[in-house]
Amino acid sequence: MNIQLSPLEARVIGCLIEKEVTTPDHYPLTLNSLTTACNQKSNREPVLNLSEAEVQDTVEGLIARRLVSDESSFNSRTSKYQHRFCNTEFGDLKLNQQELGLICCLLLRGAQTPGELRTRTNRLCTFTDVKETEAVLERLANRDSGALVVKLPREPGKRESRYHHLFCGEVDMAAFATSSDNEANASSQYAELEQEVAALREEVAELRALIERHLG
């Protein structure tokens, strides 16, 4: 895969993709609108507090790489930006609406399960069910031209595995596995503590009963 993004570039691209679909009347976006979208509290993980200068610097880097273009008119005082991330005339990355919706949501929120993605992409595309969502994710993970997403180790106590995009580089699977193991150990320790507390409560109840009988 040729496109590699920094976390801030991923946020900017994700926002431009999202707003192109959800608010077409206000797209391309001004710098102010794009900054607001980047700092949005809903459908963002993590929530950021970027300045316009930070967003501007990121956009200029993306323009230099031809992943974003300035669509403002010649005599306009306000720049308006649109993404050229995919589906451009000469670009190699071609995505259908479902694939683009999933990639957009992964860029904006990081690792998610197929169920979460089906719900969170409802304004971007449509999936019949979770199985269809997972099938599209698997297609993105097994592209002949290079994987765009990867399936992560399943977390303890979870029914579904999460998927993560690969536009910010390879995912450290060992770190995710370690995190899952730590969560499993923590869950096991918590269960043991609960059992110990329950046993102590029984002992206290028995002692109370003995004292009451003795005093009675």
From Swiss-Prot:
Cross-referenced InterPro entries = DUF480, WH-like_DNA-bd_sf, WH_DNA-bd_sf
Task: List, alphabetically, the SUPFAM superfamilies matched.
Answer: Winged helix' DNA-binding domain (SSF46785)
- PANTHER family recorded for this chain? UPF0502 PROTEIN YCEH
User: Family, per the entry?
Assistant: Belongs to the UPF0502 family.
The molecule here is called UPF0502 protein VC0395_0676/VC395_A0574
Q: Give the source species.
A: Vibrio cholerae serotype O1 (strain ATCC 39541 / Classical Ogawa 395 / O395)
